[in-house]
Curated annotation (Swiss-Prot):
It is found in: Cytoplasm. The keyword Nucleus does not apply. This is Cysteine--tRNA ligase. One of its GO terms (molecular function) is ATP binding. Monomer. Keywords: Aminoacyl-tRNA synthetase, ATP-binding, Cytoplasm, Ligase, Metal-binding, Nucleotide-binding, Protein biosynthesis, Zinc. A motif ('KMSKS' region) lies at residues 274-278. Its cofactor is Zn(2+). Gene3D superfamilies: Cysteine-tRNA ligase, C-terminal anti-codon recognition domain, HUPs. Signal peptide: none annotated.
């Protein structure tokens, strides 16, 4: 079965094919850079990173563009509060974004356009909307006239009347008086005297000011890809109004579809409530990592739910993800413990687990099912590793084990799950097997006596000497050596 993706526009699964046979274009709405990224952002950008990696695995060349919204009411407010310029605030949080995404092993985008870099394109697009009667000037602002776009609401599946009901309470009284329709939205905002200390407004034919949020993405998509992009993606909270408004702006000018596929990821929830900065229930990526959580465990947590489904964030889920990564990481390090013969890449492609993995991914990137395939391989390899290291010899031929391991590494990389090469430069004197067994026996005795301080001390002592312990459910302890740095 070819790759099928759920298209928000058609509200159904569709077989994916790009405009150009071997090249896929993707535009992902990026962050508004006024604060640090939280787990909801990790959820979005891990999802689109996996989409990109899987398309590459299928043989496509992928051009992935993700913007930064670096001018916005929230950024201006933060700059004013801090006594800084808008550019200073934006630059700080853009740098933090790159650090967070690198920690999560998210591939860099092909390009990261900033809204402030495309002001001429934005002005041209607004002028095109004015010329065609889709926009009007009011008090120095420019608004999009939604009533002029007959298919407004097609992405969210709602009529104007329904959308108006949802808009109640979101419109400032002064702004409402300038609008012809309550759902008309700002394409350009006139400069205000109180904002001059944090940014310099741009000149436009209708007056000095700055762009609205929605027009920025329309301009950046058009600059990067022309009229139509293969895939446009973002969080479900962007379906309306942001993506609905993007469609209205772009298609009114080009008369062509803005995107062939619209993909939206589900929310991260805390006690079933959406995690967001506005609700104050968010946890930043860097706070989680500062607590000692392995970035790959966080990535694994995100992947345990298919991207469109909600992901509930709990301490128990974090603990389970950390344990899962320990299992997977042990298998990924197998080559450091067991000599594996080389294999041909075709053997990975023809592996039954590769077929099962692709079946899961072809069903709208079902990472939960794909992970189940990966963990089956990991557990099989860990059993083989324990047998080999503890005198049991090979349970299967080295070639079979090597094929499994190379398949595991390849499939895990498609999900962006990659283990760093473990090393221990502190390892100076190698313990003998007998010394290791004696220390493990002493630790076991301490655990049975509930002397956990001594148990932990012995575990740490062994780890400092390059010996990693893996406690089993039956009470036994397996061990393996962590190679020292070359």
């Amino acid at each position: 079965m070819p790759l099928h993706l759920y298209n928000t526009l058609s509200r159904r699964l569709e077989p994916f094919s790009p405009l150009h046979p071997e090249r896929v274009t993707i535009y992902a709405c990026g962050v508004t850079v006024y604060d640090y990224c939280h787990l909801g952002h990790a959820r979005s950008y891990v999802a689109w990173d996996v989409l990109r990696r899987y398309l590459t695995f299928l043989g496509y060349t992928v051009h992935y563009v993700q913007n930064f919204t670096d001018i916005d009411d929230k950024i201006l407010r933060r700059a004013y509060e801090n006594g800084e310029t808008m550019a200073t605030v934006s630059d700080r949080y853009i740098a933090a974004y790159h650090q967070d995404m690198a920690a999560l092993n998210i591939l860099p985008a092909s390009a990261y356009p900033r809204a402030t870099e495309v002001i001429p394109e934005i002005i041209n697009l607004i002028q095109g909307l004015l010329d065609r009667g889709y926009a009007y000037v009011a008090g120095g602002d420019v608004y999009y006239a939604v009533a002029q776009f007959p298919s407004y609401g097609k992405l969210s599946g709602r009529q104007l009347e329904q959308l108006m009901a949802g808009a109640s309470g979101r419109i400032e009284e002064e702004e409402e008086q300038r609008k012809r329709h309550p759902l008309d939205f700002a394409l350009w905002k006139a400069a205000k005297p109180e904002e001059m200390s944090v940014y310099h407004p741009w000149e436009a034919p209708w007056g000095k000011g700055r762009p609205g949020w929605h027009i920025e993405c329309s301009a950046m998509v058009r600059q990067a890809f022309g009229a139509t992009v293969d895939i446009h993606c973002g969080g479900m909270d962007l379906i309306f109004p942001h993506h609905e408004n993007e469609i209205a702006q772009s298609e009114a000018v080009t008369q062509q579809p803005l995107a062939r596929f619209w993909l939206h990821n589900g929310f991260v929830t805390v006690n079933t409530e959406k995690m967001s900065k506005s609700l104050g229930n968010f946890t930043t990526i860097r706070d989680l990592l500062a607590q000692g959580l392995d970035p790959m465990a966080l990535r694994l947590l995100v992947l345990q739910a298919q991207y469109r489904k909600p992901l509930d964030f709990t301490p128990e889920a974090l603990t389970a993800a950390a344990k899962g990564w320990q299992t997977l990481g042990e298998a990924l390090h197998l080559h450091q413990q067991i000599p594996l013969p080389p294999i041909d890449a075709a053997e990975v492609r023809s592996h039954p687990k590769t077929e099962a993995f692709c079946q899961a991914m072809d069903e709208d990137l079902n990472t939960a099912a794909a992970l189940a395939v990966i963990f089956e391989l990991a557990k099989t390899l860990n059993r083989e590793q324990h047998r080999y290291l503890h005198g049991g010899g090979w349970g299967r031929s080295p070639a079979e084990v090597s094929r499994d391991w190379h398949t595991l590494v390849t499939l895990a990389q498609v999900l962006g799950l990659e283990a760093k090469e473990e090393s221990n430069p502190a390892l100076t004197v190698e313990l003998t097997d007998e010394e290791i067994q004696a220390l493990i026996a002493a630790r076991t005795a301490a655990r049975q006596a509930k002397n956990y301080t001594e148990s932990d001390r012995l575990r740490d002592l062994l780890l400092a000497q390059g010996v990693k312990l893996v406690d089993q459910k039956d009470g036994t302890t397996h061990w393996f050596r962590v190679p020292s740095a070359p």
